A protein has these predicted regions:
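Nucleic-acid substrate recognition interfaces
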Residues: 1-372
């Protein structure tokens, strides 16, 4: 079995908006309450409070006068919040680099909650999504869902600009057959053009955030000078949020189109396994890396390729793609200087464009890994 999610915009009425706000708040409160409980328990005797214990404590808490308001929220959404917390703790202890679970802030974190389909409590039909405690919510269904797809869960979210979305997860029987890999493409991450491929092509990435940076800074300055809580401040905050949302949507649209073009043309795409977090922390590269959305692009590539029985291959991040001559294999230590964009191989005399040569090496290494 395989999973696939579709994201649709939903249009709740005023009453449903209030119910969503209550659910967002309850889910956040449950997460923070038991995060604090887990921290104190661990500090006292180095033991963990399991999901089962947390769920029993929450059931008892709902019966008290102080926390009776939790009954107004979807009970499954509250349970899912506990599950997410439990998963976050397990991930931290398995791999500390993921970071310790943090308390959720009403201002810092986005409003969202997840609920699971049990006994038909969630349905999608005739342009409406039925949700527990919420009822029928109008939905803009821009694609047809195959009949064999089974609805498993829904994540409801609200953007800073006030729009509501439902990400619906479906389960279906995976019948994709792996294709014979004949056409290979290598991609080398490019700071300004997103990537250069092994054919020497680049996508001419527009740099949406960089283009909007001055306007964003101007509107952000206006917001910082306004009195917090005033009507004008709220209007300006919404304006800034919409600008950020526009940049995000432009980037996603571009990356979806680029990944689709590549997927349709090639059977196997080879990329470097880059440490994007380290690159984001770099003072010189942070904004550019974030604007490019390389991580998002590779995610799109991966699922699109897999849907067609194709492959995304990652070569090791320490593979010397830029230093190695793609013709004779000579390693040129001088290319460690990032300012060196073109070079001639001292051994075979081939003239190289740094990025294209790297992409060719990545493609060749990917082919070697596939055929090993």
């Amino acid at each position: 079995m395989a999973n696939r999610a579709y994201k649709f915009r939903i249009y709740p009425n005023d009453e449903q908006k209030i119910l969503f706000a209550k659910t967002f708040g309850c889910v956040r409160m449950v997460y923070n309450h038991w995060l604090d409980r887990k921290i104190r328990q661990y500090e006292e005797n180095k033991t963990n409070v399991t999901y089962t214990i947390c769920a029993k404590e929450m059931a008892a808490m709902k019966k008290t006068e102080e926390y009776r308001f939790l009954k107004e929220a979807d009970s499954i959404a509250l349970q899912q919040s506990l599950r997410h917390l439990d998963t976050a703790f397990q991930n931290f202890f398995k791999q500390p680099k993921t970071g310790f679970p943090r308390f959720k802030s009403k201002k810092r974190n986005k409003n969202s909650y997840s609920t699971v389909c049990i006994n038909g409590n969630i349905t999608l039909s005739n342009g409406y999504l039925k949700l527990p405690k919420i009822g029928q919510v109008r939905l803009k269904q821009h694609r047809i869902i195959p009949e064999e797809y089974s609805l498993r869960s829904v994540t409801v979210s609200q953007t800073p600009s006030g729009k509501y979305y439902a990400s619906i997860l479906f389960e279906y029987e995976d019948q994709v057959q792996e294709k014979e890999l004949q056409k290979f493409l290598g991609l080398d991450f490019s700071m300004h053009e997103l990537y250069r491929d092994s054919n020497g092509k680049e996508p001419a990435y527009p740099g949406f955030y960089r283009n909007a940076e001055k306007k964003l800074a101007r509107e952000q300055r206006k917001l910082s000078k306004m009195q917090k809580g005033s009507n004008n401040c709220n209007k300006q905050r919404l304006k800034v949020a919409k600008l950020h949302e526009k940049v995000s949507n432009q980037r996603k649209d571009f990356l979806h189109k680029q990944s689709r073009q590549i997927t349709n043309a090639y059977d196997c795409v080879c990329i470097e396994d880059l440490d994007m977090k380290a690159m984001l922390r770099s003072l010189n590269f942070g904004k550019t890396v974030s604007d490019n959305g390389w991580g998002m692009f590779t995610t799109f590539l991966k699922y699109k390729l897999e849907e067609q029985g194709k492959k995304l291959v990652k070569v090791g991040r320490f593979f010397a793609s830029s230093q190695t001559c793609s013709v004779c294999g000579y390693k040129n230590a001088k290319t460690k200087d990032l300012a060196l964009r073109e070079w001639d191989c001292p051994q075979c005399g081939t003239h190289h464009d740094r990025d294209v040569n790297a992409a060719v090496n990545i493609r060749n290494e990917g082919m070697r890994l596939v055929n090993a």
